[in-house]
Amino acid sequence: MTMDELFFFDGKPEELALYEALLEQIKALGAVTAVAHKTQISLKNRRVFACVSVFRVLPKRLLPAHYLVLTLGLPDPLDSPRIAAKTEAQPGRWTHHIVLAGASELDAELLEWIGLAYAFGNRNK
């Protein structure tokens, strides 16, 4: 983990622990580069396929005290109550925001979606 990633989570130890667990699962897919920005951490293979942030994608009263938002880029929309928000950012590219409150949410369904996003990011245009 880079110093920039650690700095992103400064003062947020619960979110850092969740990010570490998430990143471990994602890196099992293959080569991943994490690039920390001011408002998000982009996860890339050939292209950005996912981002991690603490954006408020739901009203504050509906969000847990500690959470991460995992944003996935996919070719098709997902239909699940776990998706907090989704939009077709451009034709054939759907952006999905998923609120994660704990490592127990890193389940088979989520890992399948991450795998789809990883493959989508790694495709040839």
Per-range role (PLM):
Residues 1-24, 29-36, 40-41:
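Charge-rich, low-complexity N-terminal segments
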Residues 1-2, 12, 87, 111-113:
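Short linear sequence motifs
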Residues 16, 54-69, 105-111, 121-125:
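Short, Lys/Arg-enriched charge-dense amphipathic segments
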Residues 31, 75, 122:
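Residue-level marker of positions within ordered structural domains that often coincide
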Residues 36-95:
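Short, conserved beta-strand/beta-arch hydrophobic-aromatic motifs that form part
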Residues 89-125:
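Well-ordered alpha/beta subsegment
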